[in-house]
A protein has these predicted regions:
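Terminal substrate-recognition subdomain of acyl/acetyltransferases
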Residues: 1-5, 9-50, 78-318
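Glycine-rich, often proline-containing surface loops adjacent to acidic residues and nearby aromatics
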Residues: 50-56
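Conserved acetyl-CoA-binding loop-helix of GNAT-fold acetyltransferases
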Residues: 56, 64-79
């Protein structure tokens, strides 16, 4: 009996004249991923690589939660490895579906700013490279996504589900560690110590939040001379991406803290509304939790910096 099936569509591999017409606004049927990358995201070279988009994947209801969907995707990858540049998917995103696709090696390339008429959800586009050309496509669109998502979260994506945002960010390839000036580290450490205010300068808090949620590695996160920053910045878990409140590692945020970063820092919701949504006792305890989360991120990204050490010593924290 057939218990798991997938429908694929071959996309890309378009001639230069078709790519140019797509870039200029013409729709090319049957090329959803290259169309979005080319017309919306302004990447005329995106329709050069050949990919297979998973249009639909389904497992019989009596055989679900046994890994059959993942096994089928692994077979598809093996079949097209060497014959295509990437596998891709576009779907109405939920935390559970994000968990599934991320676990199968697909990485975020785009999140729509409007909701899909059919699903009522934002649409996620994800890629799994099979060749150097596919890897280059996935790398640049992942990088461009990281570069633009911060601005979108305070605008078109301001009301997106925080677990969806956590998921699409965690499914990005990590970027470089964030770099803050000495002045910015002083402000962030001040909030972690309880004496400073987040509203003084939200910028460095947003960069640290995006770095943490995309899995950027820790490291030397500052400038010794306090100058300008050197860089910018079907099967799944029922409760959202990585939903374990374990805090065994000292520099790991809990899911609740991650939601707090999304809602308050990245989406800019009022503290009282965030406190109510995330079940904090009061606005004050919500902001205290925000300070605690940033103390964790200071440990991860700036714990070895002289400016951080000096500031912490002033407030009695080694």
């Amino acid at each position: 009996h057939v218990v798991s099936v997938a429908l694929l569509a071959r996309e890309g591999g378009l001639a230069a004249d078709r790519r140019a017409s797509m870039y200029e606004g013409e729709r090319v049927r049957g090329n959803m991923l290259p169309d979005v990358f080319t017309s919306q995201l302004r990447d005329e070279a995106a329709a050069v690589p050949v990919g297979y988009r998973v249009v639909r994947i389904a497992t019989h209801h009596a055989a679900r939660s046994r890994g059959l969907g993942s096994a089928l995707l692994a077979e598809i990858r093996g079949e097209f490895d060497g014959d295509a540049d990437y596998l891709g998917v576009g779907y109405g995103v939920t935390p559970q579906l994000l968990e599934f696709w991320t676990a199968n090696g697909y990485r975020t390339a785009h999140l729509s700013t409007t909701r899909n008429d059919a699903s009522g959800e934002h649409s996620a586009l994800m890629l799994a490279p099979l060749s150097p050309a596919g890897a280059a496509l996935a790398e640049r669109h992942g990088r461009w996504f990281r570069d633009r998502i911060g601005d979108q979260l305070t605008d078109q994506l301001r009301d997106a589900d925080p677990d969806v945002i956590r998921g699409v960010l965690s499914a990005c390839e990590p970027g470089a560690p964030p770099h803050l000036t000495d002045r910015e580290w002083q402000i962030v450490v001040g909030v972690g110590s309880g004496s400073g205010q987040y509203a003084t300068a939200p910028g460095p808090f947003r960069r640290l939040a995006l770095a943490a949620l995309t899995g950027a590695p820790g490291g030397d996160g500052g400038d010794a001379d306090g100058g300008e920053p050197r860089g910018g910045s079907e099967e799944g878990a029922a409760d959202g991406p990585g939903d374990s409140d374990s805090d065994d590692a000292p520099d790991v945020l809990t899911p609740r803290e991650e939601r707090l970063l999304v809602r308050k820092v990245l989406q800019g919701h009022p503290a009282d509304a965030v406190a109510a949504e995330l079940d904090y006792d009061s606005e004050r305890t919500c902001l205290q939790a925000l300070g605690s989360a940033y103390a964790t991120l200071v440990d991860r990204y700036g714990g070895d910096l002289d400016v951080v050490t000096r500031e912490r010593e002033r407030f009695g924290r080694e």
